[in-house]
Structure formats: C-alpha cells, structure tokens
Curated annotation (Swiss-Prot):
GO molecular function, one term: DNA binding
Record field: compositional bias (Polar residues): 107-124
Protein name according to UniProt: Protein max
Free-text function comment from the UniProt entry: Transcription regulator. Forms a sequence-specific DNA-binding protein complex with MYC or MAD which recognizes the core sequence 5'-CAC[GA]TG-3'. The MYC:MAX complex is a transcriptional activator, whereas the MAD:MAX complex is a repressor. CpG methylation of the recognition site greatly inhibits DNA binding, suggesting that DNA methylation may regulate the MYC:MAX complex in vivo. May repress transcription via the recruitment of a chromatin remodeling complex containing H3 'Lys-9' histone methyltransferase activity. Represses MYC transcriptional activity from E-box elements.
Compartment annotation: Nucleus; Cell projection, Dendrite
Keywords noted in UniProt: Acetylation, Activator, Cell projection, DNA-binding, Nucleus, Phosphoprotein, Repressor, Transcription, Transcription regulation
Biased composition (Basic and acidic residues): 29-40
Reported induction: By serum; in 3T3 fibroblasts.
Main location: nucleus
GO cellular component, one term: dendrite
Region called Disordered, residue ranges: 1-40, 104-160
Subunit structure: Efficient DNA binding requires dimerization with another bHLH protein. Binds DNA as a heterodimer with MYC or MAD. Part of the E2F6.com-1 complex in G0 phase composed of E2F6, MGA, MAX, TFDP1, CBX3, BAT8, EUHMTASE1, RING1, RNF2, MBLR, L3MBTL2 and YAF2. Component of some MLL1/MLL complex, at least composed of the core components KMT2A/MLL1, ASH2L, HCFC1/HCF1, WDR5 and RBBP5, as well as the facultative components BACC1, CHD8, E2F6, HSP70, INO80C, KANSL1, LAS1L, MAX, MCRS1, MGA, MYST1/MOF, PELP1, PHF20, PRP31, RING2, RUVB1/TIP49A, RUVB2/TIP49B, SENP3, TAF1, TAF4, TAF6, TAF7, TAF9 and TEX10.
Region annotated Leucine-zipper, chain positions: 81-102
Amino acid sequence: MSDNDDIEVESDEEQPRFQSAADKRAHHNALERKRRDHIKDSFHSLRDSVPSLQGEKASRAQILDKATEYIQYMRRKNHTHQQDIDDLKRQNALLEQQVRALEKARSSAQLQTNYPSSDNSLYTNAKGGTISAFDGGSDSSSESEPEEPQSRKKLRMEAS
C-alpha cells in the first residue's frame, strides 16, 4: 500500500509468507501510524467545521462535545426554519385564496355593471369605487368585509 492511497487497512495476511518478523512488525507499525494520522486529520477537520473551535487547540473530547452541541443547535435551527417555511406556505395559500375570491368578486362586479371591459373597469368595484391591491378592494359593506380583518389578524399572529 503506497503512502498516497486512501486509508485502507491491509491485513498482515495479504503480504507474502516469506517476510521476517521485523518486516511484519514494521509493516504493521506503518499501517497503525497511517490509521492514527487519518483519525488525527479527521479530528482536525471536525474541529475546523465547528464555528466555536475553528483554529483553536482542543482535546478530542472537547471537539466531540462542541461538535455535538453544534449539531443539536443546527437541528433546532433547521426545525425553526422548517416551521417558518410551513407558516409562510399557509399564509401564501390564504393569500392565494383571497386573490381568487377578489378576482371572482371583480368578475361578478363587471358582469353586474354591464359595461364593456376596459382597463379602467379592472380597477373598480361594483359600486364604482377604486379597488386597491392593498385594501382588498372593498368599499362596500359586503359579507366578506368582516372576515378579511380577522384573517389578517390571524396572519400576524402566526408570523410572530
């Protein structure tokens, strides 16, 4: 096995039978040294992967402890981010539902006015009031008005 090979521990049985005891011992020592060097390099790599240990001297026990803490921290952080993603998906679905309801209300308002569709009619409600993309376009006391502020409050509560 050459020095450039990846860490592969060869057994002494793979070597020719005619080696002397000293040769076998030297070969075994070289394999053991290579194994220890690989473990040492792996600990250094792990140490450098943990932000609180980067570039510092630390014992193997400290490296393992800090790596465990960091992994647990990252798991909690990932869980929190996943919850945020799920909340945003729910909010997005609610907003898409509101958009569909507003588009439906707009199309029914256009049918009620019996005016040909023009760019100006796209932005007015059934009573001729201006529809804003931010206020939901409701200038009337329709049934959807009480529901809209409740859903907005709910969205704010979920986000916090």
